[in-house]
């Protein structure tokens, strides 16, 4: 961060020496005025070397330091298998992302594949699934993390068919919501690893109802991955929430980047899985999401949205850039429900 502040001061000094306003330098360099202002203040956490070099070149100066380079990233992967996970599409999504942005927002974080690929310095993640969010919160705290680890090892050692169903039934107890966070988090991970096809599904009452995967051995605690996850959340400026997606992005500002990966719109003739929690995400919610997308766009926020390539979604986002991408659906209770599908990446910029 000290390097960014120093370089920001250099740019401001050179700009003033050249008698240029930020608006004039923005036009010369091709870097947005608001972005330039943040760079001069040393506030942009996701700034790239190429962008700073472009500004220096526009001022007739040479950028001497090479310190603005991406630091070596931790090796991290999602701690659960999640319907709609984006591991297979990471390269495609990243190719459509803005070059620079300030904070990163992901209001439907799910398994977090894109978050771990990007590893931004400042981010805000959210999900409607409280059990999933309880896991993320355990990575923020050393004491909770250690208790989570011990609980997961206990589940591994006790695993059996009978034990699986005993743990599955826990959410039917009225006091379940009051259990310690690490217990609910460990249960969520264990069930995901031990259930059929790694499917997270709840019924209309909110009870987890996926049958056992009949596995003899279940590995819940991947030591290297979990230690890296703990280090990641410990060293970054993170905000983790469990609320409505609209509230989760209300503080996004111009220059921030929001990635929406909601429960997908469904095809009329296909079995599409969207039951991530007891609150269905139907057409009205898709419309509300599109309204939020438009408001963010009007604020100058960079936005990408993933969804199925349906007529309904294309109509909702017809005023934006719609990119069709092939994908594979990997999680479905029926084998014939998996396979090739078409998705869209909707961006509010070219």
Each model region followed by its residue ranges:
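SAM-dependent nucleic-acid methyltransferase catalytic core
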Residues: 74-88, 95, 141-259, 263-273, ...
């Amino acid at each position: 961060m000290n390097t960014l502040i120093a370089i920001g001061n250099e740019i401001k000094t050179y700009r003033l020496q050249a008698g240029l306003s930020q608006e004039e330098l923005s036009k010369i360099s091709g870097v947005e005025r608001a972005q330039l202002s943040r760079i001069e203040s040393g506030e942009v956490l996701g700034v790239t070397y190429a962008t700073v070099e472009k500004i220096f070149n526009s001022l007739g100066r040479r950028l001497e330091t090479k310190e603005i380079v991406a630091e070596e990233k931790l090796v991290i992967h999602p701690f659960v298998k999640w319907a709609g996970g984006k591991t297979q599409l990471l390269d495609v999504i990243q190719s459509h992302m803005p070059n620079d942005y300030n904070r990163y927002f992901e209001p439907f974080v799910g398994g977090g594949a894109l978050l771990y690929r990007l590893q931004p310095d400042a981010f805000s993640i959210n999900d409607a699934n409280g059990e999933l969010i309880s896991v993320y919160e355990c990575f923020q705290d050393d004491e909770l993390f250690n208790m989570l680890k011990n609980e997961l090892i206990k589940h591994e050692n006790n695993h059996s068919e009978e034990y699986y169903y005993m743990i599955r039934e826990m959410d039917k107890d009225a006091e379940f919501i009051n259990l310690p966070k690490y217990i609910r988090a460990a249960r969520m991970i264990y069930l995901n690893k031990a259930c059929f096809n790694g499917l997270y599904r709840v019924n209309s009452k909110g009870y987890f109802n996926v049958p056992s995967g009949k596995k003899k051995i279940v590995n819940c605690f991947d030591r290297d991955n979990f230690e890296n996850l703990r280090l990641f959340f410990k060293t970054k400026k993170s905000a983790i929430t469990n609320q409505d997606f609209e509230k989760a992005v209300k503080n996004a500002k111009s220059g921030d980047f929001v990635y929406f990966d909601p429960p997908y719109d469904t095809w009329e003739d296909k079995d599409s899985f969207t039951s991530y929690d007891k609150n269905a995400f139907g057409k009205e919610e898709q419309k509300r999401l599109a309204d939020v997308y438009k408001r963010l766009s009007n604020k100058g926020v960079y936005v990408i949205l993933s969804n199925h390539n349906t007529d309904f979604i294309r109509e909702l986002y017809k005023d934006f850039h719609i990119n069709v991408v092939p994908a594979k659906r990997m999680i479905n209770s029926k084998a014939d429900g998996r396979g090739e599908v078409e998705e869209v990446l909707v961006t509010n910029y070219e």
